[in-house]
Design a protein with these regions (language model features):
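A membrane-topology feature that recognizes alpha-helical transmembrane segments
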Residues: 1-52, 57, 108-296
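IQ-motif-like calmodulin-binding regions
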Residues: 37-112
Length: 296
């Protein structure tokens, strides 16, 4: 490797480390705050719409397949029930649902609204900055190391920043913000266009549609058990499928094999139960790495 190539690698690593240590914590904190406010506003607006719906139709509940506001409230109601089964509602929201006549059980909530809002912020410890800096230094340096042209590598770096921000948010508050998924979709689509042309866009669209179909089917099967795929995860895997195109299958396999191995290790160590969920964003980042830099 020539001195010029080493200088390029060092520069990319330095830029990545700076982004990881300083930009990503700030981005994650901002996105968490925005996501909480958006979720809070949407949730209580849907609660009001639900009350209005029951006034008009007292003998039935809204369904997801209905049109307009009723369908949106049906989606909200299904999400509330799923969150209640996981014990992920706040005390205030669980009580509001009970007052509205929706039975969510006794173990539907585990924290107050104030605690949830506190979770939707991120002030990193020094070791967390160091981990983010190291991860992003490796990601940025991997682009020239794998021979990715600079303009394609720049797009993958944007994908990496978006994915890392999503990982922080998921670990902190079990959510992957919409903005992270949108950045993955746009930058990943541009990467596919530059690398594979219009065929890459078509393959990415087919992969995204297939992933959406799988998630929809899985949620139809598992919605009564509370083990359905979350909306944030669905948005993220759809964006990843579009970004990875033909490498989606291998990227997804690497992601879920890693997640299964982690869960199995946790159960063997008695740190996880059979029904315990785990944040998926760290494993989705493996999907991005395998599906773009390694195999894309």
């Amino acid at each position: 490797m020539t001195g010029y190539a080493l200088n390029v690698l060092a520069l990319c690593a330095a830029v990545g480390a700076t982004a990881g240590a300083f930009a990503i914590p700030r981005i994650a904190d901002m996105l968490l705050s925005r996501a909480y406010l958006r979720s809070y506003t949407w949730w209580y607006r849907c609660l009001d719409d639900f009350a209005h719906y029951r006034d008009v139709c007292p003998d039935r509940l809204p369904r997801q397949n209905e049109k307009g506001t009723a369908g949106a409230v049906g989606i909200w109601l299904a999400d509330c029930r799923s969150q209640a089964l996981k014990g992920a509602l706040t005390h205030e929201r669980a009580e509001a649902l009970r007052e509205a006549g929706i039975d969510v059980g006794k173990g539907a909530s585990t924290r107050s609204e104030v605690e949830q809002q506190r979770r939707c912020s991120f002030s990193p410890w020094p070791w967390q900055r160091a981990v983010l800096a190291a991860a992003m230094a490796l990601w940025f340096a991997a682009q020239p190391l794998f021979g990715v042209p600079w303009h394609q590598g720049a797009l993958l770096c944007v994908c990496g920043v978006a994915m890392a921000s999503g990982v922080v948010c998921d670990l902190r508050a079990r959510m992957i913000p919409l903005e992270c998924c949108a950045a993955l979709l746009v930058a990943g689509g541009a990467y596919q266009l530059l690398r594979h042309g219009s065929a890459g866009i078509a393959e990415g669209a087919v992969a995204a549609a297939a992933v959406l179909a799988v998630c929809w089917t899985a949620n139809r099967i598992a919605r009564k058990s509370g083990e359905s795929v979350g909306f944030g995860d669905i948005r993220c895997v759809t964006a990843l499928a579009f970004a990875c195109g033909p490498a989606t299958l291998l990227g997804a396999a690497a992601c879920y094999v890693s997640a299964c191995a982690f869960s199995l290790a946790g159960m063997l160590a008695h740190r996880l139960g059979r029904r315990d969920g785990i944040p998926m964003a760290p494993f989705l980042s493996i999907w991005l790495a395998v599906g773009t830099t390694v195999l894309g």
